[in-house]
């Protein structure tokens, strides 16, 4: 995995600074990405496995090679990682395991990627040592095959409940699957993400559009009505008495862009 540096705008612009901030910590089979945690953040990421590693890398250059890439990483060609500790540059998480299997034998390794937030007063377990209690609890929840299988079943049950409110039986299997599964799934993704991560919006610029968000509700409202209601109230809060509205707003802060729209389809 390759870790972001927590600031999408800065990640894509201030390269000289970004190459100086990356910070990681390795504890057994867990790689903690803690860039700027000491200075200003209350969150970190962790990439872990439930088995002892043979070697690891946390530097992208060390894993891929200075002129290499993910298609043919230097560590894969060499047959081992170099136990690199990233100080700046591009922090990553890579595990290497050496396994010997008898004929017909099976072994499993569980990998997890998690995000942890700590209250400001609980950031450190000792001076300069990040508080790993929540990360350790997360790893303990998914430490065995049985626990992971149970979590996957719970996830499947969650989606089954969401999708079961609208099902098509047409006699055409592919049409049924498109309408009953993928159309609903895409409607939920669109509701959550709006136009982010597209050619139109990278995720940090325009926010959520007034008109688009109203339209997105139509395909989602039957799935989680309470969230649809919350979105309607958020959208309504950007509208004025004369019927005009802020053209877009940011979903995390609920703040609006600094201009109103005169577009007819925003009224």
Indicate where each model-derived feature is located.
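Polysaccharide-binding surfaces and accessory modules of carbohydrate-active proteins
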Residues: 1-78, 95, 120-160, 164-165
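Beta-strand-rich interaction surfaces with strong enrichment in secreted/lumenal proteins
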Residues: 84, 96-100
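Short beta-strand and strand-turn-strand segments in soluble, beta-rich domains
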Residues: 86-94
């Amino acid at each position: 995995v390759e870790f972001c540096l927590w600031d999408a705008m800065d990640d894509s612009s201030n390269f000289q600074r970004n190459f100086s901030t990356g910070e990681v910590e390795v504890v057994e089979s867990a790689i903690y990405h803690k860039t700027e945690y000491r200075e200003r953040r209350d969150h970190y990421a962790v990439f872990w496995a439930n088995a002892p590693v043979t070697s690891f890398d946390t530097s992208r250059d060390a894993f891929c090679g200075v002129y290499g890439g993910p298609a043919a990483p230097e560590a894969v060609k060499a047959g081992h990682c170099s136990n690199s500790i990233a100080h700046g540059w591009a922090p990553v998480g890579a595990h290497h395991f050496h396994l010997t299997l008898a004929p017909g034998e099976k072994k499993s390794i569980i990998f997890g990627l998690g995000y942890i937030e700590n209250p400001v007063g609980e950031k450190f377990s000792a001076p300069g040592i990040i508080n790993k209690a929540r990360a350790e609890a997360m790893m303990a929840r998914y430490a065995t095959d049985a626990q992971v299988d149970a979590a996957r079943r719970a996830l499947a049950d969650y989606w089954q409940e969401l999708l079961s409110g609208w099902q098509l039986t047409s006699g055409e299997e592919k049409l049924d699957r498109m309408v009953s599964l993928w159309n609903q799934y895409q409607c939920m993704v669109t509701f959550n993400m709006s136009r982010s991560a597209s050619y139109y919006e990278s995720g940090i610029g325009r926010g959520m559009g007034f008109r688009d968000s109203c339209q997105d509700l139509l395909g989602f409202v039957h799935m989680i009505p309470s969230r649809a209601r919350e979105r309607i109230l958020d959208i309504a809060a950007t509208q004025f008495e004369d019927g005009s509205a802020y053209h877009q707003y940011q979903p995390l802060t609920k703040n609006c862009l600094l201009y109103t729209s005169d577009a007819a389809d925003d009224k």
